[in-house]
A protein has these predicted regions:
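Generic short beta-strand segments
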Residues: 1-6, 39-45, 72, 107-109, ...
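Short Pro/Gly-enriched beta-strand edge/turn motifs at strand-loop
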Residues: 7, 38-41, 117-120, 194-198
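Extracellular loop and loop/strand-boundary signature of outer-membrane beta-barrel proteins
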Residues: 9-11, 121-125, 198-202
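Outer-membrane beta-barrel translocator domains and adjoining extracellular loop/strand segments
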Residues: 51, 193-197, 240
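Long, compositionally biased, intrinsically disordered segments
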Residues: 104-109, 116-119, 128, 133, ...
C-alpha cells in the first residue's frame, strides 16, 4: 500500500505498508449477515519496517445480538497484546440500549516501540529503557454513555500513569459532556536527555518524583483542562479552555 508519492519514512510508515511472508490458518469460518464465526489458529507476517507479527490466535463470534471476542492474542517476538470484548449490536445504534465491555492488555517491547516511533537519534535508542511498556485499557458502555473502567500505562522505573473518565452523548457534538482524570508520577527520565545534542545534555537535569494531576472536561461545546505538576516543593499549574463555537 502506497498512500502518497513521498519516499517511505524510517520505521513504520502507515502511508507505505509493505507486507511479506504472509502465512495464516483460519478454520470454522461462517459469515452470513451478522452471524460470524472464525477461529484464527496461526498468523505470521513481516512488514518493511522490520515489525513482525509472529502469532495471532483466538475466536471471533457474532450473532444477531452481539459480537464476542473471548480471547484474541497478538504476538510479535518482543510484544504481546490481548483483547477480550463483548459488544451488543444495540450498543452501536442511534438510540443505544445494550452495554459493551472491552479489556485490552498489552506488553510492548522496546524494539517494536522504536520501530513504530520512526526516525530517532541513535543515542536515544540506546538510552531508552530495555523494559516493556505495559498498557491496560478497559471501557464499558455504549454510544450514549461510555466509561473508562481501567486506564494504566507504566514503563518500569521511568513513569506510571492512570486515566479514568466518562462521556455522555458520545456521538452528539452539541450535547456531548464528559470528564477525564489523569494521575502520573515519574521515576528516572534521564534517557530523554539523549534527544538533545551531546554538548547540551549536561546543562539539563530531570528530577525524579514529578507528579502530574489533571482533569479535562467537555460541556456545552466547551473544552476545559486543569493540570498541576509538582516536584518536591515546586508547583506549576495550567488552566485552559477552548470553545470552537465562540471562535467561529
Amino acid at each position: 500500500y502506497d498512500g502518497n508519492y513521498a519516499a517511505p519514512e524510517q520505521g513504520l510508515d502507515f502511508s507505505h505498508i509493505s507486507l511479506t511472508n504472509l502465512n495464516t490458518s483460519i478454520d470454522s469460518i461462517l459469515y452470513q449477515g451478522k452471524e460470524i464465526n472464525a477461529h484464527i489458529k496461526e498468523f505470521f507476517v513481516e512488514e518493511r519496517s522490520g515489525l513482525k507479527v509472529s502469532a495471532l490466535a483466538g475466536n471471533v463470534r457474532s450473532d444477531h445480538e452481539q459480537i464476542d471476542v473471548p480471547d484474541l492474542l497478538l504476538q510479535t517476538p518482543n510484544s504481546e497484546v490481548r483483547l477480550t470484548a463483548t459488544i451488543p449490536w444495540s450498543s452501536l445504534e442511534d438510540h443505544p440500549q445494550g452495554s459493551m465491555k472491552a479489556l485490552l492488555n498489552a506488553s510492548l517491547g522496546k524494539e517494536d516501540l522504536l520501530i513504530a516511533a520512526g526516525s530517532l537519534p541513535e543515542d536515544f535508542k540506546k538510552a531508552y529503557p530495555d523494559k516493556p511498556l505495559a498498557i491496560t485499557a478497559g471501557v464499558e458502555g455504549n454510544l450514549s454513555s461510555i466509561r473508562i473502567t481501567q486506564g494504566d500505562i507504566m514503563l518500569p522505573g521511568a513513569f506510571q500513569m492512570n486515566v479514568t473518565g466518562s462521556m455522555e452523548s458520545v456521538t452528539d457534538s452539541i450535547r456531548r459532556t464528559g470528564e477525564i482524570q489523569l494521575k502520573a508520577r515519574s521515576g528516572n527520565l534521564d534517557f530523554l536527555l539523549a534527544m538533545l545534542p551531546a554538548s547540551q545534555r549536561d546543562q539539563f537535569a530531570i528530577p525524579a518524583g514529578i507528579q502530574l494531576k489533571g482533569e479535562a472536561t467537555v460541556a456545552n461545546q466547551e473544552y476545559r483542562t486543569e493540570l498541576v505538576l509538582t516536584q518536591d516543593k515546586g508547583k506549576v499549574g495550567l488552566t485552559a479552555r477552548y470553545n470552537p463555537v465562540k471562535l467561529a
